[in-house]
Amino acid sequence: MLLSVLIIYGSTLIFLKVFGKQGLYCFTSIATIAANIEVLIVIIAFGMEMTLGNVLFASTFLVTDIISEIYGKKEAKTAVHIGIATSMLFIVLSQWWLLYTPAKSDFAMPAMKTIFSNTPRLMIASMLVYAIVQEFDVWAYHKWWDWTEKKFGSRYKFLWLRNNGSTLISQFLNNLLFTFAAFWGVHSVKTIINIVISSYVIFIVTSLLDTPFVYLARRMHKSEMKKVEAKQE
């Protein structure tokens, strides 16, 4: 699990370094689609039941926090809207594939149906929860930012507070709403509650672990801006 966090979170910095803001928008689309496929799989991690897509879902909060910190609230909301649009398009495409009549030699359609027959409910639940929670996360991030600036007189300091203050609350809402919307009637109530508890424990860990990556992203951006300014002089 820790290796997954390091690879996925590290990938956000690579996308930022190579492609800039557009790279983070691209990463949002990739993470949104992949997480909604992975979430079908329930695994045992650290002795608890959890869905496999937790780290990828958490990475979308990391991306919006990085964008909020570097580029601003408007750009962060754009990332959220891209994630929603990506989910909507993927729902349509994944269901369109299932309408085709496979050839006699085909071997993939049964597996595709197994995966994507559950996709609409999961994706719609995810899309609605994502829209609500990510909008809240962006709003909360900037509310924390305004509060720390007013309280301590610095707009640069206390990144860790606005990052974790917004993400931990948002992750709880995301976990609770999505798990019940996606798995009610699919798993037992006991399993759903176990998923909620275990997933939030994981989300707490992933939320705390993403803070250094936000600091690194800000430092990378600041370094790039200095290079641009040096070239212009």
What kind of feature is each model-predicted range?
Residues 1-67, 74:
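Hydrophobic transmembrane alpha-helices
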Residues 3, 25-26, 55, 80, ...:
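Hydrophobic alpha-helical transmembrane segments
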Residues 28-40, 62, 83-95, 162, ...:
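Small-residue-rich segments of transmembrane alpha-helices in multi-pass membrane proteins
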Residues 38-47, 70, 92-105:
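Transmembrane alpha-helix boundary signature
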Residues 74-82, 155-162:
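Membrane-interface alpha-helices at helix entry/exit sites of multi-pass transporters
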Residues 81, 85-104, 130-138:
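Transmembrane alpha-helix/helix-exit interface in multi-pass inner-membrane proteins
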Residues 97-121:
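Membrane-interface interhelical connector segments
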Residues 136, 142, 148-233:
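Alpha-helical transmembrane segments and their cytosolic interface
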